[in-house]
Regions:
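S-adenosylmethionine/decaboxylated-SAM
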Residues: 34-36, 51, 56-168
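Long, compositionally biased, helix-prone stretches
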Residues: 1-2, 126
Length: 168
């Protein structure tokens, strides 16, 4: 229904709204996007989204990723930056989340071996205060991929010193 709406055929979205799904978060999100003066780019995979982000990033700066897991996105993005910093426990989710138990998405403690990467292992609330207590290079791009709001807000708050109007 969403893709039809983006292509100009709103009949499917309107039918869903009429059938009692008007307050569904996905329907509301689609309606919000369609209400914009300019429809945003739609990406059907993360690589396409990353390519768009890279096109806007200052690639002479550092890259930061909060939530590395197996390192696939880090590996893709680091090729475009002189240095990269990754933060993760590598032990999975630090708490239960949407029915997933603590420890889901674990890489079993395995830290990826990626050229140009500096990984900081541990929970954000424990590692970020010390890491950002020292001067760090400004960010060209930051990938916040921590899954949890609590982890992401911690990362956002501590990463402030490396974020400016040029950071993607």
């Amino acid at each position: 229904a969403g893709l039809h709406a983006f292509a100009g055929d709103r009949s499917h979205i309107e039918a869903l709204a009429h059938d009692g799904f008007a307050d569904d978060p996905i329907i509301r999100s689609i309606e919000w996007i369609l209400s914009r003066n300019e429809t945003p780019q739609i990406h059907f995979n993360r690589w396409s989204m990353f390519d768009t982000a890279l096109a806007h990033a200052n690639q002479s700066r550092a890259f930061y990723e909060f939530g590395v897991w197996m390192g696939d996105s880090f590996r893709y993005l680091i090729d475009h930056f002189p240095q990269g910093y990754g933060f993760d426990t590598f032990e999975g989710l630090p708490e239960e989340w949407h029915g997933l138990p603590r420890g889901s998405y674990t890489s079993f403690g395995e830290v990826p071996n990626i050229l140009g990467a500096e990984f900081v292992v541990g929970e954000f609330r424990d590692t970020l205060p010390e890491f950002f207590a020292h001067e760090r290079p400004m960010a060209g791009l930051i990938n916040f991929d921590a899954d949890l709001y609590s982890s992401t807000i911690t990362a956002l708050n501590h990463a402030r010193p490396v974020i400016d109007s040029s950071t993607v």
